[in-house]
Structures are given as structure tokens and as C-alpha cells.
Design a protein with these regions (language model features):
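Membrane-anchoring alpha-helices and their flanking helix-loop junctions
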Residues: 1-108, 115, 133-176
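Alpha-helical membrane-protein architecture signal
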Residues: 111-119, 128
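Conserved SAM-binding loop
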Residues: 122
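Loop-to-transmembrane-helix entry motif
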Residues: 125-129, 176
Length: 176
């Protein structure tokens, strides 16, 4: 099972590596509009807790061992495949968005509405990648708390964020 836990954390490291150069360059541009709510910030904090902090606690302490379950090896490998798909979508979405990516709802000067690349096939590939990772996590971590917490927090985040993001895109770029 350690290999599946390692796969989970490797995926998080790969996401950081993919995002870091874009995030660094993005900070140099000027924001022309920002729509960040307290609710969104709270949910982002809970996502960090559920997707990173709790899995770290699970991995390096025995505090959550009472919530462990055991799956056959093939289930963990399905988790690895889902994670690989998630990382591909995550990478492709960042490659296509470039400096148009932002961790919060922001429109930057010279912002473009991206409809090419993966965005020409999947409307929200970044969120699709996180759905895949959320589905993979219980297969990789095999713990009722560490495995499912991120998924449970991602649901309200997704429902809140996509609606607000869609409205911001409509307000900024009009109907497609």
C-alpha cells in the first residue's frame, strides 16, 4: 500500500511543478477584475486541509489508522491510472491556459478566453483533473478520512466556483 500513498504524494508534487512557473509569471501581470469571496477562500483552505494536510497526518502518524480499510491491489492500480489521467488533464489545461490561469476568480489585463487545445474538448479540464484525483484518492490512501475528505470538500467548491467562474467569463467575454 505504501506505493499507492507514494503515488498520491508524487501527483501533488507533479502538480506543484506544473503550476509553479506559470504562477510565478502570472504574478507579474495586472489584475483588472477580481471576484473572490470569503466562502471561496474558506473552501480553498478546506481543500488544502483535505488534499494535503490530512493525507500528511495520515501518512506520518497513526492518528487516523482506525479509519483504514483494505482494497485489493488492482484497486490501487486503478487509482494510479486515474491519477495519471488527472495529471495529464492538469498539465494540458495549464499549458493551454498559460498566464490566463489564476488560483482565484481574476481577469487580468490582456486576458483571453481559451477555447483551443483541451478547452476545445472539455469545458473545464482543470476541474475534471481534480475530479479524477478526488476519485483516485480513496483508492490510493485507503482511509475513510484521508481518502474521502478532499472529495467531500471538492463538491461544494466545484458547485460554487464553476457557477461564479462561468458568470465572470460571460460578463467579461460575452456569450460564446
Amino acid at each position: 500500500m505504501e506505493i499507492f500513498i507514494a503515488a498520491y504524494f508524487l501527483a501533488l508534487i507533479v502538480e506543484i511543478i506544473i503550476r509553479a512557473p506559470i504562477d510565478r509569471k502570472r504574478r507579474q501581470g495586472r489584475i483588472s477584475e477580481r471576484r473572490v469571496t470569503t466562502q471561496e477562500q474558506l473552501l480553498l483552505g478546506l481543500l488544502t486541509l483535505g488534499g494535503f494536510v490530512v493525507p500528511l497526518i495520515y501518512t506520518f502518524t497513526n492518528w487516523l489508522d482506525f479509519a483504514d480499510y483494505s482494497l485489493p491491489g488492482w484497486a490501487g492500480w486503478i487509482g494510479v491510472l486515474l491519477t495519471a489521467g488527472a495529471l495529464f488533464l492538469f498539465w494540458r489545461a495549464h499549458a493551454d491556459l498559460g498566464l490566463n490561469w489564476s488560483p482565484s476568480l481574476e481577469i487580468r489585463e490582456k486576458h483571453e478566453l481559451i477555447t483551443r487545445g483541451i478547452y476545445g474538448v472539455i469545458r473545464h479540464p482543470m476541474y475534471a483533473s481534480q475530479w479524477l484525483l478526488s476519485l483516485a484518492t480513496p483508492l490510493l490512501l485507503q482511509n475513510w478520512i484521508a481518502g474521502f475528505l478532499n472529495f467531500l470538500v471538492f463538491i461544494p467548491f466545484y458547485l460554487l466556483r464553476v457557477k461564479a467562474e462561468e458568470q465572470m467569463m460571460l460578463d467579461s467575454f460575452g456569450a460564446p
